[in-house]
C-alpha cells in the first residue's frame, strides 16, 4: 500500500484539521469520500452509519465531502437532515480529490498507520464494509 498524502480538511464548524490526527492511532480507518449530490452516496452512507455504530470502538470512520459542485453548508445540511453521527469533514481545497486521485464518489479507503491497505470505488454495502475490516 502507498502512504497517505498529508492534507488538511475542515470540520463542519470550518476549523482546519490535519490528516495526521486521523491515521496515527492503532485503529484502522474507513475513509469515505462522498458528495451530498451523489445518488450512490445516498445509498452507501446509511450502511456507513450502521458500520460506524457497530464498529466505532475498533475502526475510525471518517467521511469527507468534496467541494466540487458543493459547499460546506450544503454538506452540513445533508448530514444534519439524515441525522448522521459519524465524523464528517469537508475537502475545502481539493487536497483529497487530488491527493488520492479520486475519479468518482463514493470512494472508500482502508487506511492503517497512514498506509492505504485497500481501495473500493463505488457503492459499498454493510457486508462489504465488514469484509474490508475483518482483520
Label every PLM stretch briefly.
Residues 8-29:
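A short beta-strand-turn-helix
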Residues 26-29, 34-37, 104:
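Short pre-active-site segment immediately N-terminal to redox-active cysteine/selenocysteine motifs
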Residues 30-31, 61, 108:
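Hydrophobic beta-strand anchors of alpha/beta hydrolase catalytic cores
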Residues 33-35, 64-66, 113:
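Cofactor-binding loop segments of dinucleotide-utilizing enzymes, especially the Rossmann-like FAD-
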Residues 35-40, 67-70, 94-96, 123:
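Solvent-exposed loop/turn segments at secondary-structure junctions
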Residues 54-92, 105:
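Conserved segment of the thioredoxin-like fold in thiol-based oxidoreductases
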Amino acid at each position: 500500500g502507498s502512504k497517505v498524502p498529508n492534507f488538511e480538511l475542515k470540520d463542519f464548524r470550518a476549523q482546519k484539521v490535519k490528516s495526521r490526527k486521523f491515521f496515527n492511532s492503532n485503529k484502522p480507518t474507513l475513509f469515505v469520500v462522498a458528495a451530498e449530490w451523489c445518488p450512490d452516496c445516498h445509498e452507501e452512507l446509511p450502511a456507513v452509519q450502521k458500520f460506524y455504530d457497530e464498529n466505532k470502538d475498533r475502526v475510525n470512520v471518517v467521511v469527507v465531502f468534496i467541494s466540487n459542485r458543493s459547499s460546506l453548508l450544503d454538506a452540513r445540511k445533508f448530514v444534519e437532515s439524515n441525522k448522521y453521527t459519524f465524523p464528517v469533514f469537508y475537502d475545502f481545497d481539493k487536497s483529497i480529490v487530488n491527493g488520492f486521485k479520486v475519479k468518482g464518489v463514493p470512494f472508500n479507503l482502508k487506511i492503517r498507520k497512514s498506509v492505504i491497505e485497500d481501495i473500493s470505488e463505488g457503492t459499498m454495502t454493510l457486508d462489504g464494509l465488514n469484509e474490508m475490516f475483518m482483520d
